[in-house]
């Protein structure tokens, strides 16, 4: 998809870069697959901020996505490719031969009129979903389950892709884009191909207001705060952080410090993403 730049009629337009998407559906989404969602503004049930830089933004309906791909052996036709405000990837509306419609994450190259199917004996073709035990080693996949039947959890964002590099016993080894090598049960399902809208990372919003419409609030530097608000705060004039290692507002080191605590699944990581 080509990139579109604008005439510098304003500072925001001067900096903006957009991805041209002529194949996206221009009408309303499928109403039966919409759900309402309310915004929390990053607050918990006590009203205290638990996630910073969240708040405001445009209202959106949630699109109910079929992450499980459990409608086995029934072919479906891609009715259209749609924009989804809740994720970076586009979504595809499938119409099954029995009349049911479902949304899936749109793989790269999938277009309206294509046919996809899910099942253990599905052909190795973009958009088809099948267990890792039936996918050839070396194949690029996305939308991978971590537990059989739980639904896709890995590689769902725009341009995401994972390579199946080995299969031994009850586990398959995957190479993630981060460089991490991870073992996943071979009964877990994955979708062939990589996620579409892979040029999303080349977009530039151009102005702060575009970020605010997405519900993202400003990030203030710790050094610009008062001493009671941040470890880097305080001091006379433009004082530095006064700390040999930058830290979060709660004193946790921010650069190179490992914060992963889930030892239960550490056994499945063959190689760390840091090499």
Swiss-Prot record:
GO terms of molecular function: RNA binding; rRNA binding; structural constituent of ribosome; transferase activity
SUPFAM superfamilies xrefs: Nucleic acid-binding proteins, Translation proteins SH3-like domain
Matches recorded under Pfam families: Ribosomal_L2 (PF00181), Ribosomal_L2_C (PF03947)
Similarity field: Belongs to the universal ribosomal protein uL2 family.
Record's subunit section: Part of the 50S ribosomal subunit. Forms a bridge to the 30S subunit in the 70S ribosome.
PANTHER family recorded: LARGE RIBOSOMAL SUBUNIT PROTEIN UL2M, RIBOSOMAL PROTEIN L2
Name under which the protein is recorded: Large ribosomal subunit protein uL2
Protein encoded by which gene: rplB
């Amino acid at each position: 998809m080509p990139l579109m730049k604008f005439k510098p009629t304003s500072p925001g337009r001067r900096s903006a870069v957009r991805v041209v998407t002529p194949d996206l559906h221009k009408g309303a989404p499928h109403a039966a697959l919409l759900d309402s969602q309310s915004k929390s503004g990053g607050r918990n049930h006590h009203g205290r901020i638990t996630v910073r830089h969240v708040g405001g933004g445009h209202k959106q309906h949630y699109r109910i996505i079929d992450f499980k791909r459990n409608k086995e052996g029934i072919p479906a036709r891609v009715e259209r490719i749609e924009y989804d405000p809740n994720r970076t990837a586009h979504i595809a509306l499938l119409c099954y031969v029995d009349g049911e419609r479902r949304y899936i994450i749109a793989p790269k190259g999938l277009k309206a009129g294509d046919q996809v199917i899910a099942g253990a004996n599905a052909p190795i073709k973009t958009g088809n979903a099948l267990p890792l035990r039936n996918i050839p080693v070396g194949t690029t996949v996305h939308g991978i389950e971590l537990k059989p039947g739980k639904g896709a959890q890995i590689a769902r964002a725009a341009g995401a892709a994972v390579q199946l590099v080995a299969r031994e016993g009850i586990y398959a080894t995957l190479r993630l884009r981060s460089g991490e090598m991870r073992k996943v049960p071979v009964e877990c399902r994955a979708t062939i191909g990589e996620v579409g809208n892979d040029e999303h990372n080349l977009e530039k919003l151009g102005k702060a207001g575009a970020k605010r419409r997405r519900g993202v609030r400003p990030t203030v530097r710790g050094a610009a705060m008062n001493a009671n608000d941040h470890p880097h705060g305080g001091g006379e004039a433009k004082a530095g952080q006064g700390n040999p290692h930058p830290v979060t507002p709660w004193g946790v080191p921010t650069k190179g410090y490992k914060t992963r605590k889930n030892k239960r699944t550490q056994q499945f990581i063959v190689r760390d993403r840091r090499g």
